[in-house]
UniProtKB/Swiss-Prot annotation:
PROSITE patterns: ER_TARGET, HSP70_1, HSP70_2, HSP70_3
Name of the featured protein: Heat shock 70 kDa protein C
Location, primary (coarse class): endoplasmic reticulum
Entry's family note: Belongs to the heat shock protein 70 family.
Keyword check for Protease: no
Cytoplasm listed as a keyword: no
Comp. bias regions, Acidic residues: 649-661
Organism: Caenorhabditis briggsae
Keywords: ATP-binding, Endoplasmic reticulum, Nucleotide-binding, Signal, Stress response
GO terms (BP aspect): chaperone cofactor-dependent protein refolding; endoplasmic reticulum unfolded protein response; ERAD pathway; IRE1-mediated unfolded protein response; protein refolding
Taxonomic lineage from the root: Eukaryota, Metazoa, Ecdysozoa, Nematoda, Chromadorea
């Protein structure tokens, strides 16, 4: 006999036997065209594409294969900078430079990690209905951006990098997230893609993507792979089996708030205390000084991966005083040892959940820039009884590489047909029953996509409504878990308690996003939600508005570029004429004095106008160039007709125009 669960108006009651239905959604053959793979990181992002049978990790306009996840607004016009340009001006414009959006995305403002981070950030984070919102100055105005909008700007940059390389528009992407990201964080990342004008065809877990990068060419039977992914802001561990192109995740664990930035912060706090002790001055009072220190500490940390000590030197750090201190590898390790050791607990948990022993692990794959830290490598090696981690993949690029391969699989690229990806959900999902008990429907580490159903009933006679409260987490009581959302099923016909049959179905899709349905089996009355977690999610109206804002920013960026190009053209043309008039071998030796004077005056006038019209629009700049050409061209043409230029062509538009460095 099937046991029925009793649903109260607020809570649900009883536990025990349930009917379970599990189905795997079939792969649909869809032709998307090119799908890029994006590793959207806390501190750096990376983009790749699978074409002609191989993955290409794409360099940005600075020639770098990883791009800082930074957005800044600078100058009187509030020009938007993204990537290297934004990070490079952090120390002179800290309040208007946004980074770490990944540490805010999908979280509540009151989240204790958000509150801890706010103390370290130079930009303002405001509370908007318990959602964090970043406030910066854009030109003369204060403007607020959600973490989704900031992440969207970084995604736009990655999209542009790919488009520049491919020479065509890109509309589809596979985007990676930490394996331990919850439902709200995954949804928010998908929303960021939508705002950026990208169709996110799949969200995949970062360690799984790295395993694809590592295991693509491994054809030697079944192997157990542990992926240890320690990046700039997040930490994941996943255990996978790889067997002839089939990648199956057995278990995953981690900390969505642990990474290289936390190591930097420890060193910064040490230096701030040291500086105060020596000089009596508090560096924290000067945001620029703190950001200068942050930049140099990050450099020092990188240096200590290959050196045993390094100097941290900053000219005029605070009140005109220079800063110079030595940082040894031993001190760096001492300051961070508890954080390094904390990475081993999730490793142990993943082994237990996979039902594997240390000796069963064939390969340890290190991913994320922070795995370059020698002490981290040493601790992992010791944990696995001296087993050396594999060094076959670039820790900065592996995740984007795997995402690009998955993009190739989905778009039907050649040579990807044998790759099958079986991922898991990181957290248990269930509903609240009477007494605040967490009744589990889908256990953690269940292979996704998956679908499970369970039958419940009413807790009171003639009860017309039941409320389904959905939670994720591992604790037995819902108060200790994370609420994803709730909804009502109404219109239940009058009946004694325990008689109505209400079937609740949980379905997790390929992106790890949950859809919940409740159906009254007697009437066929249904209600369903995709878990949106109203506290954390953006409404469709919000997303629409943000897409429009993003398009407006793209338009503004285009105007800034047009203005710069128009200024450059006028400047180049004017100075080219000035040089030619001053050169007796060129125009200077061929013009009579009156014509020479006319051109000189016109050129000086244009240069003077440029100096006093810094904010001139592209149209005004083009008009000035036209005026200058109107005065110069008749004289040069006359000279050319007379043969006085000695075969030399007139300095027409663009004759000396080059992009200036």
């Amino acid at each position: 006999m099937k046991t029925l669960f009793l649903l109260g108006l607020i809570a649900l009651t009883a536990v025990s036997v349930y009917c379970e239905e599990e189905e795997k959604t079939e792969k649909k053959e869809t032709k998307y065209g090119t799908i890029i793979g994006i590793d959207l990181g806390t501190t750096y992002s990376c983009v790749g594409v699978y074409k002609n049978g191989r993955v290409e990790i794409i360099a940005n306009d600075q020639g770098n294969r990883i791009t800082p996840s930074y957005v800044a607004f600078s100058g009187e016009q509030g020009d938007r900078l993204i990537g290297d340009a934004a990070k490079n001006q952090l120390t002179i414009n800290p309040e208007n430079t946004i980074f770490d959006a990944k540490r805010l995305i999908g979280r509540d403002y009151n989240d204790k990690t958000v509150q801890a981070d706010i103390k370290h950030w130079p930009f303002k984070v405001l509370d908007k209905s318990n959602k964090p919102s970043v406030e910066v100055k854009v030109g003369a105005d204060n403007k607020q951006f959600t973490p989704e909008e900031v992440s969207a700007m970084v995604l736009v940059k990655m999209k542009e990098i790919a488009e520049s390389y491919l020479g065509k528009e890109v509309k589809h992407a596979v985007v990676t997230v930490p394996a331990y990201f919850n439902d709200a964080q995954r949804q928010a990342t998908k929303d960021a893609g939508t705002i950026a004008g990208l169709n996110v065809v799949r969200i995949i877990n970062e360690p799984t993507a790295a395993a694809i990068a590592y295991g693509l060419d491994k054809k030697d039977g079944e192997r157990n792979i542990l992926v240890f992914d320690l990046g700039g802001g997040t930490f994941d561990v996943s255990m996978l089996t790889i067997d002839n192109g089939v990648f199956e995740v057995l278990a995953t664990n981690g900390d969505t708030h642990l990474g290289g930035e936390d190591f930097d912060q420890r060193v910064m706090e040490y230096f701030i205390k040291l500086y105060k002790k020596k000089s009596g001055k508090d560096l924290r009072k000067d945001k620029r000084a703190v950001q200068k220190l942050r930049r140099e500490v990050e450099k020092a940390k990188r240096a200590l991966s290959t050196q045993h000590q390094t100097k941290v030197e900053i000219e005029s750090l605070f009140d005109g005083e220079d800063f110079s201190e030595t940082l040894t590898r031993a001190k760096f390790e001492e300051l961070n040892m508890d954080l390094f050791r904390a990475t081993l607990k999730p490793v142990q948990k993943v082994l237990e959940d996979s039902d594997l022993k240390k000796d069963d692990v064939h390969e340890i794959v290190l991913v994320g820039g922070s795995t370059r830290i020698p002490k981290v490598q040493q601790l992992i090696k010791e944990f696995f009884n001296g087993k050396e981690p594999s060094r076959g993949i670039n820790p900065d690029e592996a995740v984007a590489y795997g995402a690009a391969v998955q993009g190739g699989v989905i778009s039907g690229e050649e040579d990807t047909g044998e790759i099958v990806l079986l991922d898991v959900n990181p957290l248990t999902m269930g509903i609240e029953t009477v007494g605040g008990v967490m009744t589990k429907l889908i256990s953690r580490n269940t292979v996704i996509p998956t679908k499970k159903s369970q039958v419940f009933s009413t807790a009171a006679d003639n009860q017309p409504t039941v409320t389904i409260q959905v939670f994720e987490g591992e604790r037995p009581m819902t108060k200790d878990n994370h609420q994803l959302g709730k909804f009502d099923l109404t219109g239940i016909p009058p009946a004694p308690r325990g008689v109505p049959q209400i079937e609740v179905t949980f379905e997790i899709d390929v992106n790890g996003i949950l859809h919940v349905t409740a159906e009254d089996k007697g009437t066929g009355n249904k209600n369903k939600i995709t878990i949106t977690n109203d506290q954390n999610r953006l409404s469709p109206e919000d997303i629409e508005r943000m897409i429009n804002d993003a398009e407006k920013f793209a338009e503004d960026d285009k105007k800034v570029k047009e203005k710069a190009e128009a200024r450059n053209e006028l400047e180049s043309y004017a100075y080219s004429l000035k040089n030619q008039i001053g050169d007796k071998e060129k125009l200077g030796g061929k013009l009579d004095e009156d014509d020479k004077k006319t051109i000189e005056e016109a050129v000086d006038e244009a240069i003077s106008w440029l100096g006093s019209n810094a904010d001139a629009s592209a149209e005004e700049l083009k008009e000035q160039k036209k005026e200058l050409e109107g005065k110069v061209q008749p004289i040069v043409s006359k000279l050319y007709k007379d043969g006085g230029a000695g075969g030399e062509e007139a300095p027409e538009e663009g004759s000396d125009d080059k992009d200036e460095l």
